[in-house]
């Protein structure tokens, strides 16, 4: 009976070692779960970006309004006959520019 008990204890110890510290053990499971969570977060961000780009493509394919808005905002274009007015904030509201210095060395 003593040899069987010793054999079962050794087998139990080996199984516990492989469960906690061995390949595909608990440490690997925790690492893989954190990797999966990080990848799912990255996938969600990329999906949101893709959805935004697809919506922009649909807007651009849908008509001239989106193209006109984009050309006005990004390129500063205006229609023929329009007058462009630029509103400049007051000096106190603008960020002060860095003073230009010259080194006379």
UniProtKB/Swiss-Prot annotation:
Periplasmic side: 22-105
Cytoplasmic topological domain: 1-3
Keyword Transcription regulation in annotation: no
Role description: Essential cell division protein. May link together the upstream cell division proteins, which are predominantly cytoplasmic, with the downstream cell division proteins, which are predominantly periplasmic.
Organism: Sodalis glossinidius (strain morsitans)
Positions of transmembrane segments: 4-21
Gene3D superfamilies recorded: 1.20.5.400
Top-level taxon of the source organism: Bacteria
Keywords recorded for this protein, A-Z: Cell cycle, Cell division, Cell inner membrane, Cell membrane, Coiled coil, Membrane, Transmembrane, Transmembrane helix
GO BP terms: FtsZ-dependent cytokinesis
Name of the protein described by the UniProt record: Cell division protein FtsB
Matching Pfam families: DivIC
Subunit structure, as described in the record: Part of a complex composed of FtsB, FtsL and FtsQ.
Family designation: Belongs to the FtsB family.
Topology with respect to the bilayer: Single-pass type II membrane protein
């Amino acid at each position: 009976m003593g040899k069987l008990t010793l054999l079962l204890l050794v087998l139990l110890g080996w199984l516990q070692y492989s469960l906690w510290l061995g390949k595909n053990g608990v440490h690997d499971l925790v690492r893989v779960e954190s990797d999966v969570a990080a990848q799912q977060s990255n996938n969600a961000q990329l999906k949101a970006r893709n959805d935004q780009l697809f919506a922009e493509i649909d807007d651009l394919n849908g008509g001239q309004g989106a193209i006109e808005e984009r050309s006005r905002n990004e390129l500063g274009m205006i229609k023929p006959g329009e007058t462009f007015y630029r509103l400049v904030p007051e000096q106190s509201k603008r960020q002060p520019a860095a003073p230009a210095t010259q080194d006379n060395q």
